[in-house]
């Protein structure tokens, strides 16, 4: 497809960046509350909860989901925290938000009987995954993340699309073990595979797969109850999200439990649903991009219409998807003329 010049988008700059060293980095009339309206409103609330600033007051009760022997998920602490606690020590995948991390760590100690966290994975740089870093770094915890995540945590992020700023972490609270290529860790009789899913939600997202338990921690690459958050401030985009979900599908079988960044543990069928939605919306937006449509014109065209009852309010998702695809037209099959 050939690209016609898009009409100007009246929205403010989205704060797009090219990598961790980029300096910019990072009312309608009331209507009856029918089921569709309720779900759209719920979806908006879920997205908003993912984008709360680091100083937000959150007192959601913590809940626990058992996943097997010495393996459980804590929810309600800003983001899902996966806890594996063999005799060798406690291993966490994500650490909750700064506001709730003390509550999360206290519950971990009470549930496991262990005082020290041996290993912490940061699945990406966002505040609700890295809230425990500043505490755990003082006790010698190994903090593992992709190198891009460490780089983002070392700069002040100005996320213009959210109209929020996120301060850098102190140097000692940043990941102390980083990687680029897929890795495997043996710990407590379990084998954990972890690797990057490029530009799926940010440019540093990783999965952590516990082979024996058959539990796949997907974090915010997988979305429940809302359209995926494409963090354009750190290079997330719709094709990256689709590629990430497809990578997770290849790792899964019918019995795999999928741990998202927020929301309930999912069956593998959820990956199929997210991939199908992303594929359809991406194709529709590519056609509109080739016709030179703006972000608002794409929103008005309702490319997500049949999915909204499940995924919620699509406006921010479409707007961020537009920002991503407009920077990568050739990867969308659109040639510039």
What are these regions (language model features)?
Residues 12, 16, 21-45:
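N-terminal secretory signal peptides and thylakoid transit peptides that target proteins
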Residues 32-88:
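Zn-dependent metallo-beta-lactamase
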Residues 65-110, 115, 206-220:
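Conserved beta-strand hairpin/beta-sheet module of binuclear metal-dependent hydrolase folds
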Residues 70, 84, 94, 124, ...:
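Divalent metal-coordination and catalytic microenvironments
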Residues 89-90, 97-99, 184, 191-280, ...:
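Metallo-beta-lactamase
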Residues 110-184, 203:
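Active-site HxH/HxHxD metal-binding segment of metal-dependent hydrolases
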Residues 286-297:
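Short, charged, surface-exposed loops that flank catalytic or proteolytic processing sites
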Residues 295-337:
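C-terminal regulatory/interaction regions
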């Amino acid at each position: 497809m050939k690209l016609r010049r898009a009409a100007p988008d009246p929205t403010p700059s989205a704060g797009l960046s090219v990598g961790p060293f980029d300096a910019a980095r990072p009312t309608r009339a009331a209507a009856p509350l029918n089921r569709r309206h309720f779900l759209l409103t719920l979806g908006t609330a879920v997205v908003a909860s993912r984008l709360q600033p680091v100083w937000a007051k959150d007192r959601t009760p913590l809940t626990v989901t058992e996943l097997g022997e010495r393996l459980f998920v804590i929810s309600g602490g800003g983001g899902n925290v996966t806890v594996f606690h063999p005799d060798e020590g406690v291993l966490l995948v994500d650490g909750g938000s700064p506001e709730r991390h003390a509550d999360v760590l206290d519950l971990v100690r009470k549930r496991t009987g262990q005082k020290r966290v041996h290993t912490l994975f940061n699945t990406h740089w966002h505040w609700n995954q890295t809230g425990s870093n500043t505490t755990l770094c003082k006790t010698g915890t190994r903090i593992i993340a992709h190198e891009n995540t460490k780089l983002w945590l070392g700069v002040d992020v100005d996320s213009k699309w959210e109209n929020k700023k996120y301060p850098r972490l102190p140097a000692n609270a940043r990941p102390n073990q980083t990687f680029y290529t897929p890795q495997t860790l043996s710990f407590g009789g379990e084998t954990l595979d972890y690797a990057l899913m490029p530009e799926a939600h940010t440019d540093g997202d990783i999965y952590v797969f516990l082979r024996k338990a058959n539990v796949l921690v997907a974090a915010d690459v997988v979305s429940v109850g809302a359209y995926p958050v494409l963090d354009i401030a750190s290079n997330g985009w719709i094709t990256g999200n689709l590629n990430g979900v497809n990578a997770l599908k290849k790792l899964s079988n019918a019995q795999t439990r999928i741990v998202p960044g927020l929301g309930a543990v999912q069956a593998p069928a959820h990956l199929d649903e997210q991939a199908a939605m992303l594929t359809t919306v991406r194709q529709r937006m590519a056609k509109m991009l080739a016709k030179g449509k703006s972000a608002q014109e794409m929103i008005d065209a309702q490319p997500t219409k049949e999915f909204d009852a499940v995924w919620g309010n699509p406006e921010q998702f479409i707007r961020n998807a537009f920002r991503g695809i407009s920077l990568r037209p050739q990867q969308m099959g659109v040639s510039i003329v």
